Amino acid sequence: MSNPLVPLRSPDWQANLGDAVAEVSWSADGSTVVAGGVDGRVALFPAAGGPLRQGFNAHAHGLFRCRCSPTEPLLATAGQDGLAKLWDPQSGALLKELAGGSAWVEQLSWAPRGKWLAFSAGKKFRLWNPTTGVVHESADHRSTVGALAFLADGSRLASACYGGVELWDVEGGRHLEHLPWKTSLVSLSWSPDGRWVVAGTQELAVQIWELPFRPGEELAMSGYPAKVRELAWHYSSRYLATGGGPEIMVWDCNGKGPAGSTPRILQGHGGKVTALSYQSAGHLLASGGTDACVFLWNAGKSSSPLRQFKLPAAITSVAWSPDGSRFVTGCRDGTVAAGSA
């Protein structure tokens, strides 16, 4: 249900994949919207709207991830066939296949400057350099790799598994540091300034490590009604937005950090928050939920949403265009829709 107190806008355009959307993304030049369905199909749409440009079956048994390089004309997908695949986001042409191993390729992440692609299958991850073709393979983790996150300059990679977070040197593929936690982690993010590594835990909390890490100084923010799978950083690294329920909690990580502080609570969704995304160089936060609504917020200034967009079904993914002027969202019923900030 939409919120009658918040200005309601209609999407600029919308289409439907025919099955639930796993993830949405934008090409590096902002001209193409990419949507990947859980059935393995990928669709390419003109960002300005109009007929489907190209559609193809990317993974025979299902798709987990669908993400464009932030700097190059490359689309990466990950699926249940044990492969990560590289595509041309304009034509849909298959450019390269990368073997993940014997397991599903569940996690995939581009370095912010596009120099490396990380993807994981089972207990290992691999790093691929699009320019040189170099591939690094990690040692086995304690369990399945649950999440991957790059440092903003692309020099380091964080990987989450049972027992904590591992930090790695990207160029050499070397293990650097272990950030301990007692159980499994369900999400992972690195602040743009590299100061904080954050993860959602099985215990309905957010765990934070400040770098350089000193044992005993890790923080835990609890009180969430569900596991926190949604994490988004403001580009300044000051604000961390978290899901884990119908409310969005925004933590101020400036100065000494969030220890002992009270988060700003954003209320508006009538169901669980399922997607969060900040503009890459702006102040707007987009949120989507099981209530089929997308809200836009200026979370640093107000606890009230600026505007809302009503979609046909629960939101599964939200992503901002490279210039921050538009967003695209995917829904559980297959809807793909774009809106303006």
Task: Show where each model-derived region lies.
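WD40-repeat beta-propeller superdomains and closely related acidic/aromatic-rich repeat-like regions
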Residues: 1-341
